[in-house]
């Protein structure tokens, strides 16, 4: 079975990561590679690490260039994906790495993104309860945000097992600068980032907040309220999320650990580390893996979970390819046997 795939937004970090993974996928043939302002350029000028694809010329991101493929990956700014996706054939598997189709609540979309809601697609985080079934045979898939991927992996087992209170969830995430994209910004230049960390989107203002609340609320079966603070870290890629929540009365440390073990022991990409071993971002760099650890703080009655992912791989492109595999009935791990990089 050979699948023809087109990738849009190929000049950016997310699009480049999709291509890196697809280049090693045993069942994929890469067709159109498109961009907008960089159309006409050699891919190797913009993504010099993609040696096997370096001579490919970027085409313009149009419906005509993307049509005729089995699968289309859209790695575009929010708003752009919905416009193109609406014009692609229903039989084409369209995988949106942008935000356009993640949120279920139109009011939340309009509040945080300021435009009309384009609708909701199956959510491409297979490790969440029920999501594998939702993705099987899907022709439209919304790739989760990178912060929500780490946050939902961190806390979903506790809410799904009815062990956590819904009203006092605090999540702090540190991300590498690639999460902000390739566009030149003063706060992302080396002199500003090296040796420094800084928060942003503080006070509930980050666009991933409603997405995190949505996922945790679905797992809990009731409204979950989240305080989310993202932080820019002096590294190119990776996310370290520390998430805490109050545990329900009578919940023990053993029950907490068992809930996370039950959720992830059979997962190929999510790893609950042995007790006492805490994860670092370097261990998952360049891979589709997530590593986590948890502890119960009896002084505050809270569970503390730390989860690390690569924001570009498990947090975007790897999760997208994993979801594609499920949708098409391929082995879920196809093309994703990537280990972390050390040192």
UniProtKB/Swiss-Prot annotation:
Pathway: Amino-acid biosynthesis; L-arginine biosynthesis; N(2)-acetyl-L-ornithine from L-glutamate: step 3/4
Active site: 146
Taxonomic lineage from the root: Bacteria, Bacillati, Actinomycetota, Actinomycetes, Micrococcales
SMART domains reported for this sequence: Semialdhyde_dh
Main location: cytoplasm
Catalysed reaction equations from the record: N-acetyl-L-glutamate 5-semialdehyde + phosphate + NADP(+) = N-acetyl-L-glutamyl 5-phosphate + NADPH + H(+)
Protein family (similarity comment): Belongs to the NAGSA dehydrogenase family. Type 1 subfamily.
GO biological process: one example: L-arginine biosynthetic process
Molecular function GO terms recorded: N-acetyl-gamma-glutamyl-phosphate reductase activity; NAD binding; NADP+ binding
Keyword NADP: yes
Function according to Swiss-Prot or TrEMBL: Catalyzes the NADPH-dependent reduction of N-acetyl-5-glutamyl phosphate to yield N-acetyl-L-glutamate 5-semialdehyde.
Enzyme nomenclature, EC number: 1.2.1.38
HAMAP family with a match to the protein in the record: ArgC_type1
Any one GO cellular component localisation term in the record: cytoplasm
Localization annotation: Cytoplasm
Keyword NADP: yes
Protein name according to UniProt: N-acetyl-gamma-glutamyl-phosphate reductase
Keywords for this protein: Amino-acid biosynthesis, Arginine biosynthesis, Cytoplasm, NADP, Oxidoreductase
Domain of life the protein comes from: Bacteria
PANTHER family: N-ACETYL-GAMMA-GLUTAMYL-PHOSPHATE REDUCTASE, CHLOROPLASTIC-RELATED, N-ACETYL-GAMMA-GLUTAMYL-PHOSPHATE REDUCTASE, CHLOROPLASTIC-RELATED-RELATED
InterPro entries, per database record: AGPR_AS, AGPR_type-1, NAD(P)-bd_dom_sf, NAGSA_dehydrogenase, Semialdehyde_DH_NAD-bd
Leader peptide range in chain numbering: none
